[in-house]
């Protein structure tokens, strides 16, 4: 507990309301951050690559490792939502990306990050190839914004996956749905989801996501309380 507190204070600052947040300025991103090889396993009979679609993307979405032993990089929401990415990869399977596109995405993808923001909405999604079109095991899409009053067009999509939810008994349906309006601190894996360019400017501001989410903490009286267990 003491070590966690030291990391928290070192990477964060306090605003006028007494709420803690990361100190990274917009445009800044940690240098030399690790890109660990994803830990991937089958879940309820579904392999890491799912049952169709973009196998490489699905494998990243289905990773289950916990941020290289908890070493998450504190990055501000503004920095994350403004990260660059190639403009010509929308709905293009990763096997068909150019080398320059791969290099541009690899610069940030697969880094364990931690950021703060406000939950603008939560939705239990339908069936997807990532989860082998299971009706029982589906993602929760969460829209994260810099301010509680922001529209989803300014949000970053972050996702709860069935594989991670299976390891987090506190992530009940009611707990996840009740996050709307709360200030949260999210830890998870940075991922570029190229499959939804039509949502830009409508229900998201970027194709970058935190996917999967590994830890969720809620601000309660100026301190972060985990809802993982």
Question: Which residues fall in each region the model found?
Answer:
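Sec-dependent N-terminal signal peptides
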Residues: 1-7
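Bacterial signal peptide processing site
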Residues: 13-15
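C-terminal motif of bacterial Sec signal peptides marking the signal peptidase cleavage site
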Residues: 9-11
